Swiss-Prot record, chain A:
Top-level taxon: Eukaryota
Species the sequence originates in: Caenorhabditis elegans
Recorded family membership: Belongs to the eukaryotic ATPase B chain family.
One term under GO cellular component: mitochondrion
InterPro entries in alphabetical order: ATP_synth_Bsub_B/MI25, ATP_synth_F0_suB
Entry protein name: ATP synthase F(0) complex subunit B1, mitochondrial
Principal location listed in the UniProt entry: mitochondrion
One protein family per Pfam: Mt_ATP-synt_B
Subcellular localization: Mitochondrion; Mitochondrion inner membrane
Length: 301, 191
């Protein structure tokens, strides 16, 4: 609030220092709540001063009183070279940008710019004397006539001061937040409008890159596929011939094996027949028994 | 063996790297080619590359009775020549046809991109020329957000601060077109 500039921070700081000193003095006392009086506790609570047994300052509803609000982030300024129209004269008619803070005033209502023109010539008191004299002249000549209810303006001024001292900080913070939200809404509309253009640029760039890659890779892949088909067919033929030659060699080997197996079978058959023929004779049985008995006798010894 | 001048055992295309750069439509095209190529690639990897070497001398020792047959087999085997062949020219022409088609497609895409860029530049220039939103004056809101604001100085419409749709129907305009008060359109004035 512009009126907060008229208050003197030094006075408040001095009072605050005195209060802090009082707290410090009490902290040296023995650490018990009984050392601080009942009404002094209430005063500490109102001022937001921690008690000796507390580590943090208590939350007070008066924290925002007599506090001057300032924007955490200033509004973006208009670019220096911004022109609404090519013919605009930026030197004599700059773009009327919105100021962040109201201009400085004196005595709650007079613009500071009215005073600075006089101040170079007459000093600090000159403007006050001029406007005061002018006011007195107007009142004296009944050019400025007071209404019977005019004295209530003083009350309104006091009420305004009361509200701005107490709730001004929160009002300013809330208004700033609402303004940011409102501007954010419009910025969202702008981004929504630009989103289509941005998306189009991205999509078209991706498609262009895709076309380039396809143009580069697709003919090669097609020809490679056909070459691979040739190679596959060739290898198929190779396999066919390999199978045929292996089959014939296996046939020849099988022929030899069959012949050898047949010879062996015939030989075994001949041997078996001879043995059976010999066994069936009676002389062989007697000769065999004699041999068996002789062998048994030898074993008995 | 084969007298082929050039043999391809594997594809020279890096499919994964190529697929990363493609948009889904083109990736679908490449996937079809990759499928066919993959079929042949698997066949190529499974089948033998060349005719095996056969030791006929050892066979002759093992099978002396068939040495004559083995001799003739050896002659036949050594004289075998498997033709490799070439890709038919008409198929290569088809590849060229596809290249022409793709070039035409690319040209069409470039034309579309140029038109789209013009539209995009219009929008971007519009907002580049606009002052910051924080410093909009009253007429700027009407100019840049016509859907949300109106200016009765030059727009023929009825103020509708509560947004109840007074401008959506012509009834009010027709009702008050005649300056006479509370006169219905169907009232007969025959006094």
């Amino acid at each position: 609030m512009s009126l907060s500039r008229l208050s003197s921070p030094q006075t408040f700081s001095r009072v605050f220092i005195v209060a802090r000193g009082a707290a410090t003095g009490h902290a040296v006392a023995p650490s018990s709540d009984n050392s601080i009086g009942y009404f002094e506790k209430i005063a500490y609570r109102f001022k937001g001063i921690p008690l000796p047994t507390e580590t943090e300052a208590p939350k007070s509803m008066f924290d925002a009183c007599n506090k001057e609000w300032s924007a955490p982030e200033l509004l973006p300024s208009v670019p220096k070279d911004f022109k609404e129209h090519p013919d605009r004269d930026l030197t004599n008619y700059p773009y009327p940008s919105r100021p962040m803070y109201p201009p400085k005033t004196r005595l709650l209502m007079m613009p500071d710019s009215w005073f600075t023109a006089f101040q170079k010539v007459t000093g600090t008191s000159g403007p006050y004397l001029f406007f005061g004299g002018l006011f007195a002249f107007l009142v004296n000549k009944e050019l400025w006539v007071f209404e019977e209810q005019g004295h209530m303006t003083v009350g309104w001024i006091l009420f305004y001061l009361l509200v701005s001292r107490t709730a001004g900080y929160k009002i300013d913070a809330g208004l700033y937040k609402d303004y940011q939200e409102r501007v954010g809404f419009f910025k969202g509309l702008i981004q929504e409008d630009l989103k289509e253009a941005v998306d189009f640029r991205k999509t078209s760039a991706a498609q262009t890159a895709s076309f380039a890659a396809l143009k580069e890779g697709m003919p090669t892949s097609l020809k490679d596929s056909m070459q691979l088909q040739l190679e596959a067919a060739y290898r198929k033929n190779v396999q066919t011939i390999s199978n045929e030659i292996k089959r014939r060699i296996e046939y020849l080997k099988e022929t030899e094996e069959t012949k050898a197996r047949f010879e062996r079978d015939q030989l075994l058959k001949l041997i078996n027949d001879s043995v059976e023929k010999q066994v069936s004779q009676k002389d062989f049985q007697e000769k065999f028994l004699q041999n068996a008995i002789q062998q048994l006798k030898g074993i008995a010894v | 063996m084969s007298g082929a001048a050039k043999r391809v055992a594997t594809s020279s295309v890096n499919w994964s790297k190529l697929a990363e750069r493609l948009v889904p439509e083109h990736a679908a095209e490449l996937t079809r080619v990759k499928g066919v190529s993959g079929t042949f690639q698997s066949a190529v990897s499974q089948l033998p590359a060349d005719l095996p070497k056969i030791d006929f001398a050892a066979l002759k020792k093992a099978l002396p009775a068939h040495s004559a047959v083995l001799d003739s087999l050896q002659k036949q085997y050594e004289s075998v020549k498997i033709p490799y062949g070439e890709v038919p020219a008409e198929y290569l022409k088809e590849v060229d046809q596809w290249v022409d088609y793709n070039n035409a497609r690319i040209k069409l895409h470039e034309v579309k991109v140029a038109d789209g860029l013009q539209e995009a530049k219009k929008v971007e220039e519009k907002w580049a020329k606009a002052p910051p939103v924080e410093h909009f004056d009253r007429q700027h809101f009407v100019e840049y957000f016509p859907a949300h604001f109106y200016d009765l100085r030059y727009q023929n419409r009825i103020p509708d601060p509560c947004n109840i749709g007074l401008n959506e129907t012509p009834e009010i305009e027709n009702r008050f077109k005649d300056y006479k008060v509370l006169r219905r359109a169907d009232k007969v004035d025959d006094h």
